[in-house]
Regions:
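Sec/Tat signal peptide C-region and signal peptidase I cleavage site
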Residues: 18-23
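Bacterial N-terminal signal peptides
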Residues: 9-17
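N-terminal mature ectodomain segment of secretory-pathway/periplasmic proteins
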Residues: 24-103
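Bacterial N-terminal signal peptides that target proteins for export
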Residues: 1-9
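Solvent-exposed helix/loop surface patches that form functional interfaces
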Residues: 33, 86-197
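Short, structured coil/loop segments at alpha-helix boundaries
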Residues: 2, 61-64, 117, 168
């Protein structure tokens, strides 16, 4: 990721924590089976039709050997649409995945680790960051920040949604009375559940 992108990414994340009087903060615990292995903090700041989201997580997993996983995501909305954002995933201190997006003259320039670069005009107003705070009622796609693309969303029961992502990955989101209660993450070597704290 070019140096400019690192600078803007840092700015976005700091912006999400600025103006705490307008901030909404949520906490989730991360579970692997019966063991709590980490936590997630999600923050949203509103300024009219603009908003900034920041989501950070930390977990320690035993998969063959100890794995320390840290993830960070920030997304800025302007006029109700994603405008700029980034994600990063570190495994045992080393960068494993990242993505970055910025708006240039009305076109979103997207970069996905390690070398993918593409542009898009206008992503979905719904994103995984927004799904921490609102139930995506009536939505058939959601913008996924880690891949910088709209991905299919399927409602399978009342308050239950399956988000399908590239690589045959999927997450199950469970809501009650419009509030996110849990996210089930099923990957090749590990199954995790994020539970509302």
């Amino acid at each position: 990721m070019p140096r400019f992108f690192h600078t803007l990414a840092a700015f976005l994340f700091v912006l999400a924590f600025f103006s705490t009087a307008c901030a909404q903060q949520l906490g989730f615990t991360i579970w692997k089976g019966e063991n709590m292995v980490g936590g997630i903090t999600a923050i949203r700041n509103h300024a009219g039709v603009n908003a900034t989201y920041a989501v950070s997580s930390y977990s320690e997993l035993e998969i063959v050997m100890k794995q320390v996983v840290r993830s960070t995501m920030a997304l800025e909305y302007r006029a109700g649409r994603p405008f700029a954002g980034f994600t990063s995933l570190h495994l045992n201190g080393s960068l494993r995945d990242s993505s970055f997006m910025r708006n240039m003259a009305g076109t979103l320039n997207c970069f996905v680790h390690p070398k993918e670069h593409f542009t898009m005009k206008e992503p979905n107003a719904w994103s995984t960051a927004r799904m921490y705070f609102e139930e995506p009622v009536g939505q058939s796609t959601v913008f996924v920040e880690s891949v910088m693309r709209d991905c299919p969303l399927t409602r399978t029961a009342e308050g239950v949604y399956v988000l399908s992502m590239p690589g045959k990955k999927s997450n199950i989101y469970r809501y009650k009375d419009g509030l996110l209660q849990a996210v089930e993450v099923d990957r090749m070597f590990v199954k995790l559940v994020f539970k509302r704290a």
